[in-house]
Amino acid sequence: MKKKNHKYRGKKLNRGESPNFSGQHLMHNKKLIEEIVDRANISIDDTVLELGAGKGALTTVLSQKAGKVLAVENDSKFVDILTRKTAQHSNTKIIHQDIMKIHLPKEKFVVVSNIPYAITTPIMKMLLNNPASGFQKGIIVMEKGAAKRFTSKFIKNSYVLAWRMWFDIGIVREISKEHFSPPPKVDSAMVRITRKKDAPLSHKHYIAFRGLAEYALKEPNIPLCVALRGIFTPRQMKHLRKSLKINNEKTVGTLTENQWAVIFNTMTQYVMHHKWPRANKRKPGEI
């Protein structure tokens, strides 16, 4: 079998640098690391999950603040370093495994991570696709472009909309690529995710809502009445517009989470179940 060429094949690495096959960029700025932990606002009552622990720069600080730290790392060399650095911290467990193959904690947990850019979307899906999980809040460092897509007021994607029905997602601040080793080609962002105390929908409706969101956001720039005409009758749509207090030109991509809740509740109350749109199954990295 012919070997597949990799973008790092033949690249000369700096001293101490490991091949970065997952898109992992390690933070080395101590003030930035302390800021991340401070903004996470964790206590000894918290179980903290760190995804992509690297050499433990963030892990060691988390170990001093949290009740329990679960540090996930797949690189064997990094795992050895992590094990040595956290040897004195009995509250810290090193999980030597692929991030996408782990089982999330059953208890309530917090995520504080500088995640590998290459698997940003799969990680977000893992954390947010099940609103009934124990995930409560997080501070996650990710590629700036992804952060902007997840937080944009104009919503184009059904997954992002569904996540934001149950979680608040916002950019805390941008981070220069100079704070990482090896430095990425683009800047990063610190993102805060918080579970909504009063979500507009029950988490049991997640799959059904995803179906509605996926159907409606096929063309996010078109008017709502056009996007949903396959679901609602003209009479139902007229009633819905009055409930939403919008005109005929309101586009689906500009609706708020609360307006989407009204649309979903109207559908479940007045539309026959067989007319409800179904969500398509996608691969973990697709969005």
Swiss-Prot record:
GO terms for biological process: response to antibiotic. InterPro entries: KsgA/Erm, rRNA_Ade_diMease-like_C, rRNA_Ade_Mease_Trfase_CS, rRNA_Ade_methylase_Trfase_N, SAM-dependent_MTases_sf. Residues 1-13 have a biased composition (Basic residues). Its EC number is 2.1.1.-. It is an enzyme of class 2 (transferase). Keywords: Antibiotic resistance, Methyltransferase, RNA-binding, S-adenosyl-L-methionine, Transferase. CDD domains: AdoMet_MTases. S-adenosyl-L-methionine binds at H25, M27, G52, E73, D98, N114. Induction: By erythromycin and oleandomycin. Residues 1-21 are annotated as: Disordered. GO terms for molecular function: RNA binding; rRNA (adenine-N6,N6-)-dimethyltransferase activity. It comes from the Bacteria. Belongs to the class I-like SAM-binding methyltransferase superfamily. rRNA adenine N(6)-methyltransferase family. Involved in erythromycin resistance. This is rRNA adenine N-6-methyltransferase.
